[in-house]
């Protein structure tokens, strides 16, 4: 069926479009304008038309996500029972995630922490999220097998083969490195780790582990750069860790997760841990400007109750003292040790207010929103449903000033946010939430409205209240089919799980099988993600090609 979206303000920065025009769709794809009469015309007069939103970093599936629901069941408001069902969905469930992203105009979301040892369970949860295409990033950097290879000096080929085998068996879309060596060091009593500190038992450092993974990702041709969670997250002086890690990449492609939590400069150099922190947003952005090989997502903080989820067991163990309410879970399992710690970002608290300001400052200082991706590191900085409010604050300096006026003076004393007058345009919002994350993930078929793109389209009524505008899309199309009308889901269906098209090296498979049998008494099949685990004839997975 040929469909024309007519009369809307079409915003597609990848094509230089920001004007009233039409978008043509046929067979689930954007097509060139046709001389044929459309079978259907969608009136978008008075509306803004964008590609569907793309989420690059949101914790939406996996063991720690499940644990967070059990630990803090009151975090989300439960939904009403669907028609024909006796029970309501649990708050934060797959249907809640899919519906709330779709209402905001998002059509793709990525879970950034896919533990290879828990890959099947995580993929089953991802497959339970309706309306969205989704994927996961395989976590490496603390597992004993990789660290053994590096300790024994087996060379780049062996590391590459192990990374490729892990991607193939976990069906990951990319690779994430979380405080490389930190979980391993924690098991030997280490409570703080920096880039060049030695990791007990292995004689390695974060720098060496990360460098090996950077090389492997490039050699395999993974479209998404190595997704890095640095040392010392959330501590005064964390900006030093990010900048040092950026320089250690030595020009190789690298993506930094939740940069806001690293944009903390030391206030008192003589008492760095007790003197508090100040914004290092200017320093972080200057460093990024000097290194075009790098990108980051923000990890914006929003006020209110949340729960922090991370495989960075060092940080979660340290953060347990600030848990609110006072309950937490810490796990030191092989490779994927981590923790779940509830946290309250107090609306008038000086620390929370400064964190809030730093995230906005990072985005408003960025000269290239395509390299500055909007995230809240859901749920760590807050719930992703706050994106519309964040967008409002970026687009409206007056609204931002009103909010700042309600916050403690520390926001002006230790950040530059109150002095920034910049307002984001629609094109910059599209870069921040569409073209930037799609390009970063290597998903060339989305994030834009050029010919050949997936017909994932969001149509918003142009409203000066940008929070309202982006909270409830007028119409959302997924593969050309309407899934949301006037902010309500009108059709439920399952999207695809995106996974990298790679094959495991036969020799490394044999080595991995032997290693796992010796260590766990279980082989590769135990950790596999077979098609048979998913409903027949649904085509759950969709391959994403490696870079040439």
Swiss-Prot record:
Its EC number is 3.5.1.-. GO terms for biological process: formaldehyde catabolic process; one-carbon metabolic process. Signal peptide: none annotated. Zn(2+) 1 binds at residues 57, 59. It holds the Pfam family Amidohydro_3. It is an enzyme of class 3 (hydrolase). CDD domains: FMDH_A. GO terms for cellular component: cytoplasm. Pathway: One-carbon metabolism; formaldehyde degradation; formate from formaldehyde (H(4)MPT route): step 4/5. GO terms for molecular function: hydrolase activity, acting on carbon-nitrogen (but not peptide) bonds; metal ion binding. Its cofactor is Zn(2+). Binds 2 Zn(2+) ions per subunit. Its main location: cytoplasm. Zn(2+) 2 binds at residue 227. It catalyses: N-formylmethanofuran + H2O = methanofuran + formate. Keywords: Cytoplasm, Hydrolase, Metal-binding, One-carbon metabolism, Zinc. It is found in: Cytoplasm. Involved in the transformation of 5-formyl tetrahydromethanopterin (5-formyl-H(4)MPT) to methanofuran (MFR) and formate via the formylmethanofuran (formyl-MFR). May be catalyze the hydrolysis of formylmethanofuran (formyl-MFR) to yield formate and MFR. Octaheteromer. Part of the formyltransferase/hydrolase complex fhc; composed of FhcA, FhcB, FhcC and FhcD. Belongs to the metallo-dependent hydrolases superfamily. FwdA/FmdA family. This is Formyltransferase/hydrolase complex Fhc subunit A.
């Amino acid at each position: 069926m040929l469909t024309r979206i007519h009369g809307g303000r079409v915003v597609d920065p990848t094509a230089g479009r920001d004007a009233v025009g039409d978008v043509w769709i046929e067979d689930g794809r954007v097509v060139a304008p046709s001389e044929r009469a459309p079978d259907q015309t969608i009136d978008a007069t008075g509306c803004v038309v964008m590609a569907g939103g793309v989420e690059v970093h949101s914790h939406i599936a996996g063991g720690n996500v499940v644990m967070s629901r059990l630990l803090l069941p009151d975090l989300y408001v439960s939904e009403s029972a669907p028609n024909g069902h006796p029970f309501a969905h649990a708050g934060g469930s797959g249907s809640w995630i899919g519906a709330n992203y779709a209402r905001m105009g998002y059509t793709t979301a990525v879970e950034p922490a896919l533990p290879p040892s828990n890959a099947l369970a995580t993929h089953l949860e991802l497959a339970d999220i309706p309306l969205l295409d989704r994927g996961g990033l395989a976590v490496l950097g603390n597992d004993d097998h990789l660290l053994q290879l590096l300790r024994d000096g087996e060379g780049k080929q062996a590391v590459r083969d192990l990374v490729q085998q892990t991607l193939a068996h976990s069906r990951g879309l990319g690779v994430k490195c979380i405080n490389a060596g930190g979980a391993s060091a924690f098991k030997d009593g280490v409570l703080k780790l920096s880039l060049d500190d030695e990791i007990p038992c292995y004689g390695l450092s974060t720098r060496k582990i990360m460098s090996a993974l950077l090389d492997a990702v490039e050699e395999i041709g993974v479209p998404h750069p190595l997704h890095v969670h640095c040392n010392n997250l959330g501590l005064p002086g964390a900006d030093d860790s990010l900048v040092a890690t950026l320089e250690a990449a030595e020009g190789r492609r690298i993506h930094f997760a939740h940069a806001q939590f690293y944009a903390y400069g030391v206030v008192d150099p003589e008492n760095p841990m007790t003197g508090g922190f100040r914004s290092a947003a200017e320093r972080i952005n200057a460093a990024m400007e000097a290194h075009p090989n790098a990108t980051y997502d923000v990890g914006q903080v929003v006020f209110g109750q949340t729960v922090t989820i991370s495989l960075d067991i060092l940080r979660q163990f340290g953060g347990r003292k600030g848990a609110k309410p006072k309950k937490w879970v810490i796990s030191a399992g092989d490779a994927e040790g981590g923790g779940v710690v509830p946290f309250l970002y107090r609306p008038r608290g000086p620390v929370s207010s400064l964190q809030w300001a730093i995230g906005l400052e990072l985005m408003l200082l960025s000269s290239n929103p395509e390299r500055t991706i909007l995230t809240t590191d859901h749920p760590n900085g807050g719930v992703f449903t706050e994106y519309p409010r964040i967008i409002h604050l970026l687009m409206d300096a007056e609204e931002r000033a009103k909010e700042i006026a309600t916050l403690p003076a520390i926001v002006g004393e230790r950040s530059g946010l109150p002095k920034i007058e910049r307002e984001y345009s629609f094109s910059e919002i599209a870069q921040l939430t569409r073209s930037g994350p799609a390009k970063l993930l290597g998903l060339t078929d989305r994030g834009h409205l050029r010919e050949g793109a997936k017909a994932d389209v969001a149509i918003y009524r142009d409203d000066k209240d940008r929070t309202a505008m982006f909270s409830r899309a007028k119409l959302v199309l997924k593969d050309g089919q309407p899934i949301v009308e006037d902010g309500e889901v009108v059709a439920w269906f399952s999207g695809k799980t995106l996974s990298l098209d790679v094959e495991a090296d036969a020799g490394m498979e044999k080595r991995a099988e032997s290693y796992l049998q010796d260590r766990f008494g279980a082989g590769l099949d135990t950790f596999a993600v077979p098609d048979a685990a998913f409903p027949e004839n649904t085509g759950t997975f969709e391959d994403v090609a490696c870079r040439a």
